[in-house]
Amino acid sequence: DFTVAYQRSSGDTGYNYGFYQNQGAVGDGGTTIWVANSFWSDFNAEDERSWQFGYGHDFTQYGIPGLSYNFAYIYGTDINVGGPESGSEREIFNQLKYVVQSGAAKDMSIRLRSSFLRVSNNASAYNDDGNEVRIFVDFPMHIL
């Protein structure tokens, strides 16, 4: 499956989750957030526009039910940094996931996720460069 997404943030600040960095105010979008391009970075700085190109694959057809892979490249531009040039950021996201198909651990999933984020120097007050690798283990509990 292929994904193409566009997202635009507008207002007096980026989306601040209660407070945006040190700006201390809720932007004109209120307190609701629905973002298409949210991985490590949410790509929601002041005036930011972002594009995502992604790909996901289910390996069931290759005889490995429960295994999937997702990739995304997200590029954000037009970050208002209060100067003559706008800032930018980009992220590469990878995730490998396996869901146990049967037995006592049925529906348990293990995800290996990596992200590589790069932010232009003039937007460093908004976000920082970084690399991360995370492992998630989700074990659903069926109570009722």
Each model region followed by its residue ranges:
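Short loop/turn motifs that connect adjacent beta-strands in outer-membrane beta-barrel proteins
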Residues: 60-67, 101-110, 142-144
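Residues that define the transmembrane beta-barrel architecture of outer-membrane proteins
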Residues: 47-51, 86-92, 127-133
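Extracellular loop and loop/strand-boundary signature of outer-membrane beta-barrel proteins
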Residues: 38-42, 79-84, 120-125
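Outer-membrane beta-barrel "beta-signal"
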Residues: 32, 53, 94-96, 129-144
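Transmembrane beta-strands of outer-membrane beta-barrel proteins
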Residues: 1-4, 53, 67-71, 94, ...
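Transmembrane beta-strands of outer-membrane beta-barrel pores
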Residues: 6-12, 49, 59, 73-79, ...
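Extracellular/periplasmic loop regions
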Residues: 1-65
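C-terminal/domain-terminus segments
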Residues: 66-95
